[in-house]
Each structure stands twice: as structure tokens, then as C-alpha cells.
């Protein structure tokens, strides 16, 4: 089971996605209400636009009273040249994975799949903000980042399930590989000619 968060589209049963509620169904969370809420910010920190987006998301979350959380490696990369850093907690060190409410993924489909791998045995929903070339799994674009974070701050999302599958490859009666996949898996020839 993989739990993912999403803003707009309908999702198949299996993994959870959060959907932003339509206008008119919002409730406003005050800063004191947000205290204690922990949001995982997962970014493709090898790309400048993802580092900038992560800094922006962390600052916006912190300003609203939420606790931004990142992996140690992402935070170390992000901390370089951060003009106005905000306090960010480290998952598995100062914050347990089970205490995270939601993960926001800043990158393309590859980043979303890596984040899904991290949280797949939990009930943490993920919401993807597309910064990559392929964004089939993301629910919003980089230009919508502030609005997406505002929806997270105000708890303006619902969680839906998405299908995750276990994959096994067998050869001559022996299992040679097993893994999991989100939506689909494919088998290709070893030699592509």
C-alpha cells in the first residue's frame, strides 16, 4: 500500500492521495492549531529549482506554525546558501515517520516514486508539485506551490487510495527479483537491439 496526496484528480483504490477541497469547503486553521503538525518536504535537491521550491515551502510552512521535516541529506544540501533558513526537523532523528501528517514532494515523477518508497509502509499521504519534465503523478505545478502549501496549512485536502503492486520475477522456477510498483511494472529484454 502506498499513500499519496493529490489536489485535483480522482484516484484508484490502493494508495492514498490527498485532494484539495473545492472553494467554499475550506476551513481556516489558525497558527496555534497548526502547532505540532509535521509536514515532510521531499525535494529533488540536485536541481536548483527544487532547492528554491523546498526553501519556499519550508518557510511558508514554518511561518504558518507547522514543522517542516526533511531527510538529513536533503537538509544538508538545502542548507548551503540558504539566506534566511528556518528550523527544519530531520525525519528518523528528531521526528519519527509515524508523526508526519503529510508529505509534499517537489520534483518530477521520479521524486514522487522515491518519496513513495520512503513512506509506503505508513499512512502518510503525498502530494506532488511537478518541477520535472514528466509530471503524471504530480497534482500541481511549480507556479501553484504557494497555493498548494496554503491548502496544506489549512488542511484543505482529502485522502484517496492509489494502487500499489508487488512485483516478482521468476526464472526457471526461482524468484530472481521482487519489488513494488505504483500503477504499473514492465519487463524488458536485457539486450535492446
Regions found by a protein language model. Give the residues of each.
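Short glycine-rich anion-binding loops that position phosphate/pyrophosphate groups of nucleotides
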Residues: 45-46, 109-111, 134
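Generic N-terminal amphipathic, Lys/Arg-enriched alpha-helix
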Residues: 17-45
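Catalytic core of DAGKc-family lipid kinases
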Residues: 136-193
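Short glycine/serine/threonine-rich phosphate/pyrophosphate-binding segments
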Residues: 50-51, 110-116
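Short, acidic/small-residue loops that bind anionic groups at enzyme active sites
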Residues: 122-140
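Short acidic low-complexity segments
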Residues: 87-100
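Short beta-strand segments of a lipoyl-like beta-sandwich/carrier module
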Residues: 1-11
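Short internal beta-strands
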Residues: 66-73
